[in-house]
């Protein structure tokens, strides 16, 4: 019998998963749940090819981790088999706490608990079932293990998570800017004093990686239409929750019903086992099915928003460098309340104002150290002659004003 499973991945080709702990994790219901959650949430409203799942991403990140371990050990860095297995387990599980449309759900139904916190709760739960086999993986995930570079490979400036999602999201969206040379970057990685370093000849690959990341953020992750559909979904779920707490009957799967009909805050999410039980039953299907049914609900606000999501009649978006004036806000709200024959308070569900800040490189987060032939190291910000790190480190702030289109306003 074969000692491994081989999975064919469109981005990296054949991925080998050894039988035993790692294959058990891949087959675990909590990881299989990620096959029903899209990696890019609502980005398919802009890039129809972006249908890939968080499960595919987890496998890709695992594959890159396996390659990295090979290259790092080939350079004379000693890694125990138990450490290699643990860091591979940690990367397989790094996204296990994501819900459907992750950030939307965190902010509307899950009481503000982040997916990282939920990932850890689920890892600890799996560890009990697996009789402590994930102890080391959890230590690495929490950055409590002495070999710091192992944590950096799971969560850092050059982690396997980023190296996979930039390549994968680029592949499925068709936005070629994200197509980084992950294989070359991995070949250039080394370890010094238990921290990750990059050989100086890999400097151009790192520059390309940082630029790609910035381009992908503005072109894909923060694309104005994706932001608009996300805001629309936030408002739809917020309205549904408001109606539910007023006792209005709404169609929902049992797991979604739990979150709609219970006011949940962070404390309760941590203390009530029901919260986690219901959370792991949720995936994209719960949300889409509810939206389809809500499209015909008697509440005008809920049905209009739900139809907008289902039929891609999304909010109109304006991106500006300064916030909206009070007068402009009033003008939009009164137009919407007339258009839908609803009051001003209800009209607020059809207007969303937010600002987004992004800087691609925060030195304090986790700098990228370049190592030279003589063993000395310098931060990429100082080592790079081509890359304007001061530009990449600068905060870019944009204001997004999303609102219901007027009736005579097409797409």
What are these regions, as identified by a protein language model?
Residues 1-86, 100-106, 110-411:
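Histidine-centered, transition-metal-coordinating active-site segments
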Residues 87-92:
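Short alpha-helical catalytic segment bearing the HExxH-like zincin motif
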Residues 93, 97-98:
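Short active-site segment of divalent metal-dependent hydrolases/proteases
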